[in-house]
Amino acid sequence: MTRYIFITGGVVSSLGKGITSASLGAILEAQGLTVTLLKLDPYINVDPGTMSPFQHGEVFVTEDGAETDLDLGHYERFVNATMTRKNNFTTGRVYADVIRKERRGDYLGGTIQVIPHITDEIKAKIREGADGADVALVEVGGTVGDIESLPFLEAIRQMRIELGDQQTLFIHLTLVPYVAVAGEIKTKPTQHSVKELRSIGIQPDILVCRSEQPLPDAERAKIALFTNVPEPSVISLSDVKSIYEIPLILRDQGLGNRVCEKLNIKATAADLDDWKKVVQAQKNPRHTVTVAVVGKYVDLEDSYKSLSEALIHAGIHTQTRVVIEYIDSEAIELHGTELLKKVDAILVPGGFGSRGIEGKILAAQYARENGIPYFGICLGMQIAIIEFARDKAQMENANSTEFDPKTPFPVVALVSEWMAKEGIIEKRKWGDDLGGTMRLGGQPCRLKIDSLARRLYGEDRVIERHRHRYEVNNDLIGELEKKGLVISGRSIDDRLVEMIELADHPWFVGCQFHPEFTSTPRKGHPLFIGFIKAGLAAKEAKKAVLAAPSQEKTD
């Protein structure tokens, strides 16, 4: 029997419902329970795949190829469960499925309404996503009071009636602000948020109160009194330097035990030693390395959320504080590579469109010519190949057909056919819809013997997640190999280039996939760990060069 924990948010958005849900999931998992997490998004887009990163932040790709909310990345980083397309759905997806059923005649000519048809579809999708788990944590996107969230809130209200309070539990995340002028913590926004939630039939069982500082006992008691929530169930969650401290903070306040008690679950004590080690390693680095992330969405760092977390994970596993310098590739086009001179390593992430491309190409050239560790992910690999073709293979005006359809040397072109990991041949062509038509999800990759990639992974076959429409053009790859480009990874059917490197460079790696999606704080990822180690080595080498003249003078 699956128990359901519904997490809602009030007062303001961006309080951290996703991280709170994931942290509770980590606690319950450490108590011996099988956990999964779902995210319900109230927007009308079918999925976030075609949404601007400036609007939505990162699109997280699951193993089965779904384009989902970035919160699913938090879920996978905190718990051991692998998310699928069933773990995230939107209002748009729900309505599309209901309308499809209506057109098919499934409702036998009935009038289709929000209640019961939309709410029934939401409940069915929640049950489907939760199937097989001891506990399903269901995060409802948006803020209580938003009109968009009402169908979801109504659906979970109905689930409480249908399943009872031994199988369902409501957690409400809310803000308790500190008003500096008055020198007081204000509980009124939380009181009103709970009042709004109760007005639609939901009484929270547990409150998680977000604040700048830990909540004093007096305010905790006041909140309990006015919201009809027992005082031990009012949890204080203040700001922390690292999100990986949150499972420990919530465990220490007894949240996991409180949940198990309310849901009548017999569970063991939560063993969070792994999280203690992560936090200790993050708080006590022995080294520092500066990494430039050269992209076009740098004004919103959530656009690269999994990427920044993967770099942090690599720092944890190398005892290194990773300083991330986000650099707009258009700024490099305007001001040149001077912006890169103080960094120890350069990373160019994925992206779409021609804006800022030449700045990224300049960054790859700067890294190649100056022996600086370079990590190109997805588009970052493609622009490294474009730069190499132009400079080393004398392919003037080489480009991707994404940016220049008439380029004389299309070293990167639309991928029209590939074999998925199930052995199925998938095809795409010009003019296809943008949504859901990319090469998506986990795909197997065969690594070249004696390559850097093979040494980093420690195995000859890996599965990594993809999200792209364009690939290296096999018709031109032979010429690039003659000039020193190493194809260190290929698709399992040998049709597609998955990884590249340069043999005469200290550390120059490109991959067509997105390794950041599978990095976790407890394990890291071999490519990111190798990249940070290379950055440290480059930093030490630079120090040695700078110290050499003064050493000679001393001699």
UniProtKB/Swiss-Prot annotation:
Keyword Magnesium: yes
A Pfam family annotated for this UniProt entry: GATase
Domain of life: Bacteria
KW Nucleotide-binding (keyword) present: yes
Binding site for L-glutamine: 351, 379-382, 402, 469
Region Amidoligase domain, annotated ranges: 1-265
UniProt-listed Enzyme Commission number(s): 6.3.4.2
Binding site for CTP: 13, 146-148, 186-191, 222
Reactions that this protein is recorded to catalyse: UTP + L-glutamine + ATP + H2O = CTP + L-glutamate + ADP + phosphate + 2 H(+); L-glutamine + H2O = L-glutamate + NH4(+); UTP + NH4(+) + ATP = CTP + ADP + phosphate + 2 H(+)
GO cellular component terms, semicolon-separated: cytosol
CDD domains from the UniProt entry: CTPS_N, GATase1_CTP_Synthase
GO molecular function, one term: CTP synthase activity
Biochemical pathway: Pyrimidine metabolism; CTP biosynthesis via de novo pathway; CTP from UDP: step 2/2
Gene Ontology BP term (one): 'de novo' CTP biosynthetic process
Positions of ATP binding: 14-19, 71
Subunit and partners: Homotetramer.
Miscellaneous notes: CTPSs have evolved a hybrid strategy for distinguishing between UTP and CTP. The overlapping regions of the product feedback inhibitory and substrate sites recognize a common feature in both compounds, the triphosphate moiety. To differentiate isosteric substrate and product pyrimidine rings, an additional pocket far from the expected kinase/ligase catalytic site, specifically recognizes the cytosine and ribose portions of the product inhibitor.
Function text: Catalyzes the ATP-dependent amination of UTP to CTP with either L-glutamine or ammonia as the source of nitrogen. Regulates intracellular CTP levels through interactions with the four ribonucleotide triphosphates.
This protein's name: CTP synthase
